[in-house]
């Protein structure tokens, strides 16, 4: 059995998708059983992979490391001190062939694993796991079906604010240049982790832009890039809507 014990703590929702898929890909490559933390696991980054997806192939929920706690899950260094369980982190941000080929049963995966090379060989199974539950998918389809032409425009702020040196926030000039690739009459759905900020920007006053400011938020606070703590937006509906649109204007992010 292998797992990803810090799933939901080591990065936000987009990171969790890659981490889950990489865990599954490594397990399939070696013929291992695999597990992920249960739905009610308390984390520091809004654990949510159970909520929107069917996860058809999930069989085991739990942890590879014993005696875990939210404090132990907070960092890779902390989790290494729990016990003798091997905790294995990728060597860099590129595909780690050595990790992929030599991952031992009974180990715990860590890192961001942001490349499809970890799970390309089981792509269809990953797509099946990430099918949206009907209570999320159907309202989104009904909304999108109202429009003959609709694309989404992604505004990523959140924990990037205050860390622009290495997580740049794109300018309105970028969005202007990107919009030139689409018809003038296309509707533009604004998908963002900061709808309140977007609502204050005159850029989005045009009727072509569709912006929902009544977005559900997580109950607990999450640390932002500027050092403040906020209730961050639940991203499931936006992700589902984006998957149904006919085109995209992306901002730099894991989901982008």
Residue ranges and their predicted role:
Residues 15-18, 22, 171-174, 255:
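Conserved alpha-helical elements of sugar-nucleotide-dependent glycosyltransferases
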Residues 10-11, 39-44, 114-115, 156-160, ...:
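Short, solvent-exposed loop/turn segments at secondary-structure junctions
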Residues 43-185:
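Secretory-pathway luminal glycosyltransferase catalytic domains
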Residues 1-7, 135-140, 221:
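Short amphipathic alpha-helical segments and their helix-coil junctions
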Residues 13, 183-256:
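Donor-binding and catalytic core of enzymes assembling or modifying cell-surface/extracellular glycoconjugates
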Residues 1-8, 33-37, 107-111, 148-162, ...:
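Short hydrophobic beta-strand segments
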Residues 22-26, 174-181, 241:
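Amphipathic alpha-helical segments that form well-ordered structural scaffolds
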């Amino acid at each position: 059995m292998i797992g990803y014990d810090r799933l939901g703590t080591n990065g936000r929702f987009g990171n969790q998708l890659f981490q889950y898929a990489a865990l599954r890909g490594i397990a399939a490559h070696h013929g291992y059983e695999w597990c992920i933390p249960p739905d009610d696991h308390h984390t520091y980054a809004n654990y949510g992979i159970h909520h929107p997806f069917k996860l058809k192939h999930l069989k085991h929920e739990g942890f590879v490391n014993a005696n875990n706690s939210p404090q132990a899950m907070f960092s890779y260094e902390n989790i290494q001190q729990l016990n003798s369980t091997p905790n294995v982190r990728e060597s860099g941000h590129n595909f780690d062939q050595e990790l992929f080929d030599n991952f031992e049963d009974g180990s715990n995966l860590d890192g961001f694993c942001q490349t499809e090379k970890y799970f390309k060989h089981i792509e269809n199974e990953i797509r099946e796991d990430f099918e949206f539950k009907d209570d999320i998918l159907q309202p989104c389809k009904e909304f999108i079906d109202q429009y003959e032409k609709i694309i989404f425009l992604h505004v990523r702020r959140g924990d990037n604010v205050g860390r622009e040196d290495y997580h740049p926030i794109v300018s309105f000039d970028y969005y202007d240049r990107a919009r030139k690739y689409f018809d003038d009459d296309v509707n533009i759905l604004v998908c963002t982790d900061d709808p309140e900020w977007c609502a204050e920007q005159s850029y989005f006053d045009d009727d072509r832009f569709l912006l929902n400011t009544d977005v559900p938020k997580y109950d607990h606070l999450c640390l932002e890039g500027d050092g403040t703590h906020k209730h961050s937006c639940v991203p499931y509906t936006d992700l589902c809507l984006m998957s149904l649109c006919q085109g995209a204007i992306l901002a730099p992010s894991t989901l982008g």
